[in-house]
């Protein structure tokens, strides 16, 4: 009989979805010479807030 092991899912990883607007802006980011600036027009689907669509 093999020994039983216990798995702790909360160690190192927490399942779930973060709200997008909490992760899309990084104020401490510093631009680099290799960064590319792009402008895109995004039209959200019905029921999606504009800031979530971009």
UniProtKB/Swiss-Prot annotation:
Disulfide bonds: none annotated. GO terms for biological process: photorespiration; reductive pentose-phosphate cycle. GO terms for cellular component: chloroplast. The modification N6,N6,N6-trimethyllysine is found at residue 14. The modification N-acetylproline is found at residue 3. Its EC number is 4.1.1.39. Signal peptide: none annotated. Residues 1-2 form a propeptide. InterPro entries: RuBisCO (IPR033966), RuBisCO_lsu_N_sf (IPR036422). Its main location: plastid. It is found in: Plastid, Chloroplast. Keywords: Acetylation, Calvin cycle, Carbon dioxide fixation, Chloroplast, Lyase, Methylation, Monooxygenase, Oxidoreductase, Photorespiration, Photosynthesis, Plastid. It catalyses: 2 (2R)-3-phosphoglycerate + 2 H(+) = D-ribulose 1,5-bisphosphate + CO2 + H2O; D-ribulose 1,5-bisphosphate + O2 = 2-phosphoglycolate + (2R)-3-phosphoglycerate + 2 H(+). GO terms for molecular function: monooxygenase activity; ribulose-bisphosphate carboxylase activity. Belongs to the RuBisCO large chain family. Type I subfamily. Heterohexadecamer of 8 large chains and 8 small chains. RuBisCO catalyzes two reactions: the carboxylation of D-ribulose 1,5-bisphosphate, the primary event in carbon dioxide fixation, as well as the oxidative fragmentation of the pentose substrate in the photorespiration process. Both reactions occur simultaneously and in competition at the same active site. This is Ribulose bisphosphate carboxylase large chain. The lineage of its organism: Eukaryota, Viridiplantae, Streptophyta, Embryophyta, Tracheophyta. The gene is rbcL.
């Amino acid at each position: 009989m093999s020994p039983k092991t216990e798995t702790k899912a909360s160690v190192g990883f927490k399942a779930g979805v973060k709200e997008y607007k909490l992760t899309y802006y990084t104020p401490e980011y510093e631009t680099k010479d290799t960064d590319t600036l792009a402008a895109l027009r995004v039209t959200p689907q019905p029921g999606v807030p504009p800031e979530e669509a971009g």
